[in-house]
Design a protein with these regions (language model features):
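Short, intrinsically disordered, charge-balanced linker/junction segments flanking boundaries
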Residues: 145-150
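Active-site-adjacent loop/helix surface patches within enzyme catalytic domains
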Residues: 2-142
Length: 150
């Protein structure tokens, strides 16, 4: 798994269940001081974990997520929850016009439909549930604002 380099800013994880921090430089401030009150789940759709982490953490790719949940259940944090990760693109939902500013983005390592769409391992699902529960408690996210898309 790629490691953070000395020139990358490091931060303290927002959750005690985070096993590693690999900082992404692809983030910004939340618009108008907006607080995150939504969780958006994605799967990576890439053939391997190294490629997915490189895509999310390499400066200039203009994509990131707050968390990555690995197949073995480990959780990597790439962007502090207080910041705006770039995982939702130009998107709209239930009157929200800037999903990146109101959400915590979680990428779930899975090759997706282009590579046979394997089942999500039970360890990965358990870790994802624990992570989401913690975020929901910390940020007071109601269950109807936990969303997923491919």
């Amino acid at each position: 798994m790629p490691r953070a380099t000395a020139d990358m800013k490091t931060f303290t994880p927002d959750s005690s269940i985070v096993s590693d921090v690999i900082p992404s430089m692809n983030y910004g401030d939340r618009n108008k001081g907006r607080l995150a009150d939504m969780i958006l789940l994605h799967y990576t759709g890439m053939p391997d974990v190294e490629g997915a982490i490189a895509q999310l953490c390499t400066p200039g790719t203009d994509v990131s997520a707050h968390y990555i949940v690995l197949e073995d259940g480990r959780i990597v944090q790439c962007v502090p929850e207080a910041k705006r990760a770039w995982h939702a693109g130009v998107s709209f939902w239930a009157g929200e016009e800037d999903i990146n500013s109101c959400s915590i983005g979680i990428e779930i390592i899975n090759r997706g439909h282009d590579w046979g769409y394997p089942d999500f391992p039970l360890r990965q699902i358990a870790a994802l549930i624990a992570l989401c529960r913690g975020i929901m408690l910390r940020r007071k996210v109601p269950s109807h604002r936990v969303l997923a898309h491919s």
